[in-house]
UniProtKB/Swiss-Prot annotation:
<dbReference type="GO" id="GO:0098869">
    <property type="term" value="P:cellular oxidant detoxification"/>
</dbReference>
<dbReference type="InterPro" id="IPR050056">
    <property type="entry name" value="Hemoglobin_oxygen_transport"/>
</dbReference>
<dbReference type="GO" id="GO:0070293">
    <property type="term" value="P:renal absorption"/>
</dbReference>
<dbReference type="GO" id="GO:0005344">
    <property type="term" value="F:oxygen carrier activity"/>
</dbReference>
<dbReference type="GO" id="GO:0015670">
    <property type="term" value="P:carbon dioxide transport"/>
</dbReference>
<dbReference type="GO" id="GO:0019825">
    <property type="term" value="F:oxygen binding"/>
</dbReference>
<feature type="modified residue" description="Phosphoserine">
    <location>
        <position position="51"/>
    </location>
</feature>
<comment type="subunit">
    <text>Heterotetramer of two alpha chains and two beta chains.</text>
</comment>
<dbReference type="GO" id="GO:0005615">
    <property type="term" value="C:extracellular space"/>
</dbReference>
<feature type="modified residue" description="Phosphoserine">
    <location>
        <position position="45"/>
    </location>
</feature>
<dbReference type="GO" id="GO:0030097">
    <property type="term" value="P:hemopoiesis"/>
</dbReference>
<dbReference type="InterPro" id="IPR000971">
    <property type="entry name" value="Globin"/>
</dbReference>
<keyword id="KW-0561">Oxygen transport</keyword>
<dbReference type="GO" id="GO:0042744">
    <property type="term" value="P:hydrogen peroxide catabolic process"/>
</dbReference>
<comment type="similarity">
    <text>Belongs to the globin family.</text>
</comment>
<protein>
    <recommendedName>
        <fullName>Hemoglobin subunit beta-1</fullName>
    </recommendedName>
</protein>
<dbReference type="GO" id="GO:0015671">
    <property type="term" value="P:oxygen transport"/>
</dbReference>
Length: 147
């Protein structure tokens, strides 16, 4: 569960409506793979991940980023039940994919960075703080099965 004030909820919902989630997802996942190259090991089937330009232009990275951000979007609709919303994905990433749960936090930070890039001056420090709460809640929910 994420506890947001009414002002934080308004900021998150208002700003989220101003971005193209598909662009945010692909760019955030791409940045994760570039900035933290050890995360590439989970994406062997994605083809060429040999350089930043290859990663950022990779259609499989963009497609998976879209899936990631669609799940994130579902989380925004269920901030009071993130553990329930992400239970299946938590189990999948823990039991089948064996993803290090720290990567969820790293990806959340990439989402925040990309939002800042796309929203510019509208992404105020208060808006960033609200989104940091959300991505921390999502990362915690995704890591829930690991506990």
């Amino acid at each position: 569960m994420v506890h947001l004030t009414d002002a934080e909820k308004a900021a998150v919902n208002g700003l989220w409506g101003k971005v193209n989630p598909d662009d945010v997802g692909g760019e955030a996942l791409g940045r994760l793979l570039v900035v933290y190259p050890w995360t590439q090991r989970y994406f062997d089937s994605f083809g060429d991940l040999s350089s930043a330009s290859a990663i950022m232009g990779n259609p499989k990275v963009k497609a998976h980023g879209k899936k990631v951000i669609n799940a994130f979007n579902d989380g925004l609709k269920h901030l009071d039940n993130l553990k329930g919303t992400f239970a299946h994905l938590s189990e999948l990433h823990c039991d089948k994919l064996h993803v290090d749960p720290e990567n969820f936090r790293l990806l959340g930070n990439m989402i925040v960075i990309v939002l800042g890039h796309h929203l510019g001056k509208e992404f105020t420090p208060c808006a960033q703080a609200a989104f940091q709460k959300v991505v921390a809640g999502v990362a915690s929910a995704l890591a829930h099965k690991y506990h």
